[in-house]
Every structure is written in C-alpha cells, then in structure tokens.
Amino acid sequence: MWWKTTEDTLPTGARLLSLILYSDATTTDTLGKNQLHPIYLSLGNIPTWRRNKQDAKKLLGYLPILKAANNTEKKSSIFKNLVRETFHKSLKLLLNPIISLKTGVDLLINDKSTWFYPRISVIIADWPEASTFCLTYKSSNSKLPCHFCLVTRDNLANINLLSSDTEPRTHQNMRNYFEENNEKSVCIESVYNFFWNMP
C-alpha cells in the first residue's frame, strides 16, 4: 500500500526507487572498547532473494560515535542531545545527495532508461537505534514507548485495541508536537529530526 501511495505522488512516468537503510553500531575489538557505526543501503526494487546477497548492499558510510569524557558527562542531557543532533546531521550529510534529487534520476536497467525518484522505505535497526532514528524515548518504560504510534505503555499488550484507538506517529504530527514545544507529551526528544523534511 505504501509503495502504490508513494508512487502515485510522483510525476507521470516516474517510478519509485525504494531505499532500505541498515544500521547497527558494532564493536571492533574483543574488549568492546572500540566501536564503528556503519550504515548500509540496499534497494527495495531488488527481489528479496537477490537483496539478501552480500553484493546487493553497499556501505553508505560511518556515523560518528561521540565519546564522553566521563560518566557525569555521558549522563548529562546536553551530551545526550549532542549525540542525537550529531546522528541526525550526519544522516543528512550522507543522504541529502540522494534525497535532494528534485527531478529524480535516470537509471539504465536491462539497456532501458527508467526514471526514478528515491524514497526511504525501510530503516532496519535494533531498539536503541530505532529510538535514535525516531527520537523517541529509549526506555520501554516511557509513557508512549512505541516507535510507530501513540499507544500507552499500559495498552501495548491489549489485543482488543483497534487502530482507530491510537494515533500513528507520522512525520507531520511529530513535527507539530516538536514545533509547539509539546514533544515531551508524546515522548520524543527535544532535537530536530532529519526525516521530518523528507518527501
């Protein structure tokens, strides 16, 4: 459904270039002291059986990992916000050349030129990274712990809850809460989210 809806917003004759991002910070030594934070790119247009091959994913770059001078600094809200801001500004730096293609891009597929517009369709990440991408509170004990909707913690396991009983977390409504200084009411961090500007 997302694919069709998104493709309908593109100019006539253009197709969707589905970007899939994979991100996971990893340790690079046996002591766990050194870390790298790679971000990979794949395409949703590639069939799943092919997309899972090693050569169908490309390293887009490494996101910086900020190190605190001490535990006090590490726990400070200033440092935590700096980490979040750095993450989102780094994503902007990495993704802007792709996303800002105002007239799309022509790709040669089977000797035929096809007009595409790139859009991020999926971000694959673990819980802490999903929180960083969405800028939601990291604790599963927060009032609204879900990255996708504004369901309360008490209703997370409620199997009788209807989708109409919750409000989805969309770019627009999260941005509105942020711009109205109400981000804490929906458990998002006080940092501007790069993805709010994405088409």
Residues covered by each model-derived region:
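Acidic, metal-ligating active-site segments
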Residues: 22-68
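Charged (Asp/Glu and Lys/Arg) segments that form or flank catalytic channels of large polymer-
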Residues: 1-25, 62-64, 69-91, 95-199
